[in-house]
């Protein structure tokens, strides 16, 4: 629902003035709007304490889920700030997966920087990565060989429809030792575990937005997300070749990039 805070943001971003035919523009603005929603809730310690009360049930739900995902207790926090600037660039010069950051300061004067990846969608799964096979394999640590060529075939064919049953089985088997690194890289651009590195998110925030309206939010730390995807990929039919991700192609890339949804 549109709370007082969320209603103000909808006004600020002019969402209701956008024609319903402008899907791309609307999606972009909603993306920025929901990033700002998080930034405002965690703007400072006064805002966080205010919105973590029963007077603001929706914002309390969001802030409580975020703190729980980080295993943090509000009583131990003496200061908080949020930002969406100075997020840095990847080694390749591109934008990181981080959309915003929150910094918590605790009673013992230590602090913790939490990079966030924030998305909104009406769908259960959203696009988390769109890269070519060379970039993917380099990032995950997959060397030249059968596994890499099977991934390349998926990219070139833009699906697994032309795979034989044996090729599907081989891709699943060969990818199994890399599953954790593969999933982690897709959502953070780093195959190894990381914490507090501004280039690599520690939390995934997924707003469910249907017909432009807030419905719910899911917030997970990276370890829990990876575990959930592996559990999904371990089901009998081995979805996503054991990764639990949807493998598809990047629109307009002409078989030069793959896209993963999760």
Curated annotation (Swiss-Prot):
Coiled coil: none
EC number(s) reported in the record: 3.1.21.4
One annotated GO molecular function: type II site-specific deoxyribonuclease activity
Keyword Nuclease: yes
InterPro entries named in the record: Restrct_endonuc-II-like, Restrct_endonuc_II_MspI
UniProt key word Nuclease: yes
Name assigned to this protein: Type II restriction enzyme MspI
Originating species: Moraxella sp
């Amino acid at each position: 629902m549109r709370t007082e805070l969320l209603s103000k943001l909808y006004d600020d971003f002019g969402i209701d003035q956008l024609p319903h035919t402008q899907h791309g523009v609307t999606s972009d603005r909603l993306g920025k709007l929901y990033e700002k929603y998080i930034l405002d809730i965690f703007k400072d310690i006064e805002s966080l304490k205010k919105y973590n009360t029963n007077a603001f049930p929706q914002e309390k739900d969001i802030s409580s889920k975020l703190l729980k995902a980080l295993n943090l207790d509000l009583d131990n926090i003496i200061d908080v700030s949020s930002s969406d600037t100075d997020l840095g660039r990847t080694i390749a010069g591109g934008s990181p997966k981080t959309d915003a950051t929150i910094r918590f300061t605790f009673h013992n004067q230590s602090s913790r920087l939490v990079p966030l990846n924030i998305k909104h969608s009406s769908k259960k799964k959203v696009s988390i990565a769109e890269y070519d096979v060379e970039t993917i394999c380099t990032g995950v640590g997959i060397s030249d060989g059968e596994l890499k060529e099977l991934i390349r075939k998926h990219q070139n064919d833009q699906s697994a429809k032309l795979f034989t049953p044996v090729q599907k089985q081989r891709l699943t088997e060969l990818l199994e030792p890399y599953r954790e690194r593969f999933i982690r890289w897709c959502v953070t651009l780093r195959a190894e575990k990381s914490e507090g590195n501004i280039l690599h998110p520690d939390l995934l925030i997924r707003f469910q937005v249907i017909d432009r309206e807030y419905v719910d939010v899911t917030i997970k730390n990276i370890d829990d997300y990876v575990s959930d995807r592996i559990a999904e990929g371990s089901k009998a039919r081995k979805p996503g070749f054991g990764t639990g991700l949807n493998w598809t192609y990047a629109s307009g890339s002409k078989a030069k990039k793959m896209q993963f949804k999760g």
